[in-house]
Amino acid sequence: MLFKWIDHPSFRKHEQMMAILYEMGMADKRQLQTVTGWSLRTIRWAIEKIRAKGATPEEKDEWVRSIPLPKRTSPREVAYALGRMGIRYVQDMMEEQQHAREAPEAQVKHFLGINDILIRVMEKVPREDLVWLSSAEATDLLLRTWERRREERDKRYFIRPDARLGIRDRRYWIEYDNDTEGARKLERKFHGYVHLNDSTPVVWVAPNEKRRDYLQTLWKNTVKAFYSNNQSVPEMHFFVAGKETPFLTKEETEAVLV
């Protein structure tokens, strides 16, 4: 529950920032500004306050890392992510024992792409009307669903959504595809959503039209090959990044619905 950490009465400002980075995985200054509503100066102060827990540059990175982003691929300067000590500190704050690893630098585009979906929605919808679950929280929700149904979880169909978005009374599973996953992994995720037997729409966001069309075709072929006997399948909506916002916020949409 990302937004509950903002101005949390039990945590200091820099601790709130640590909890927010823990939930987001990785984020740049612009994303942090939008999510928190804090000034850029406050964001910088909070980051430096966290890093000050370490004495050497290496120890500072154990608390929060600054990951440079190539200017040719992004106008952003750096992305921030918690290091090993930062993750452990937040888990103690939250009284969580679950395993969490550092966000891999190789997935920086993926994390920022997921966060951008939220940022675009926040530009249209008040924060108090939003619920945003991280991948870990969305996965935990699925686990609780399996347990509530008293069904044995089939590992073949177990999925880890990128996020779950709630806007007032509407809910969506969110998947950001950065054109890195192969057909086999995507098909496995498609099967996972079918076997959820859940009516929540799945929104796929791709970096370009070519990738969006590929995902759409792959989903069509999966349905035709495995679920053509009138078996219920979830709504799958496919968008180029940025085009999903009107659909999610119920404005005029350019969705490709299958």
Residue ranges and their predicted role:
Residues 69-70, 107, 123, 128-172, ...:
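Active-site metal-binding core of divalent-cation-utilizing nuclease and nuclease-like domains
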Residues 88-135:
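Amphipathic alpha-helical dimerization/coiled-coil segments
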Residues 43, 114, 159, 186-189:
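Amphipathic coiled-coil/heptad-repeat helices and related helical stalk/stem segments
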Residues 37, 167-170, 196-200:
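Short glycine/proline-enriched coil/turn segments at helix->beta-strand junctions
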Residues 9, 15-18, 29, 180, ...:
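Non-catalytic C-terminal interaction segments of nucleic acid-processing enzymes
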Residues 1-102:
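Nuclease-adjacent, charged terminal/linker segments that flank catalytic cores
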